[in-house]
Curated annotation (Swiss-Prot):
UniProt xrefs under InterPro entries: Ribosomal_bL32 (IPR002677), Ribosomal_bL32_bact (IPR044957), Ribosomal_zn-bd (IPR011332)
Region (Disordered): 1-24
Stored PANTHER family: 50S RIBOSOMAL PROTEIN L32 (PTHR35534), LARGE RIBOSOMAL SUBUNIT PROTEIN BL32 (PTHR35534:SF1)
Chain's gene name: rpmF
Keyword match Ribonucleoprotein: yes
One GO CC term, this protein: large ribosomal subunit
Keywords tagged on the record: Ribonucleoprotein, Ribosomal protein
One GO BP: translation
Family, per entry: Belongs to the bacterial ribosomal protein bL32 family.
Organism taxonomic ancestry: Bacteria, Pseudomonadati, Pseudomonadota, Betaproteobacteria, Burkholderiales
Source organism of this protein record: Ralstonia nicotianae (strain ATCC BAA-1114 / GMI1000)
Name of the protein in its database record: Large ribosomal subunit protein bL32
Domain of life, per lineage: Bacteria
Keyword Phosphoprotein: no
Any GO molecular function: structural constituent of ribosome
Cleaved signal peptide residues: none
């Protein structure tokens, strides 16, 4: 079993854990409808970058 040779300082411990925390997903607002959606994804209304790309049930 591996055993460390020297104690890891609090600074180095923090640097090691720096990428462990979750980040929020990038959110975009559709210019046409004002709908909130994930970036590079179609909005719930079927719009992508100001154009209607998917037919929805309401159409």
């Amino acid at each position: 079993m591996a055993v460390q040779q020297n104690k890891k300082s609090p600074s180095k411990r923090g640097m090691h854990r720096s990428h462990d925390f979750l980040t929020s997903a990038p959110i975009a607002v559709e210019a046409t409808t004002g709908e909130v959606h994930l970036r590079h994804h179609v909005s719930p209304n079927g719009y992508y970058r100001g154009r209607k790309v998917v037919k929805t049930k309401n159409d």
